[in-house]
Amino acid sequence: FESLPSEQARNRGGLHTRGLSDELVCIPCAVDLKGNSVSRIAKLGKCSKDALHKVFDGRIADNTIICSDGDSSYKGFAENNNLNLIQVKGGKKSIKNFNIQRINNYHGQLKKFLDIFNGVSTKYLNNYLIWNNVLMYGKVYLKNRISILFDATASAYISIRAVDVNKRPTIPILV
């Protein structure tokens, strides 16, 4: 017998690496007490202090208090950027008045939002993150939301010819 050619196992949802690996995308997220949020693709694999710096550079004021989980990358990021860090270790949700419930809620809403689309390509993930932030955390009037969304789409790279689709950058980053 000769076997029929078939797709590779990974394309059918098989063989993959467990845990944090280069198959997962690192998306650092931040939400402040006013409801402003920042999230953007940093890299593939486990998050690092350089990846955090890439996303949050210039967006967090000096001497700000950051509340995060026990990941060691936040410690290096806080030391390099003159920030105060409170880490909530695993199994706990708060330390005194500081908690990670706000960011956990953000992650839950983001997952629900992305589940609607049955998987999003990494190439377009930043655009979906912006869309989610405008819908969920844009604490502004509808007219302002529309102008923010219009500005984000107008500044995106748009190609008219179908031939140029393959020449687009793999991860469009909207600022």
What is each PLM-predicted segment?
Residues 1-175:
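Residue-level recognition of single "structural anchor" positions
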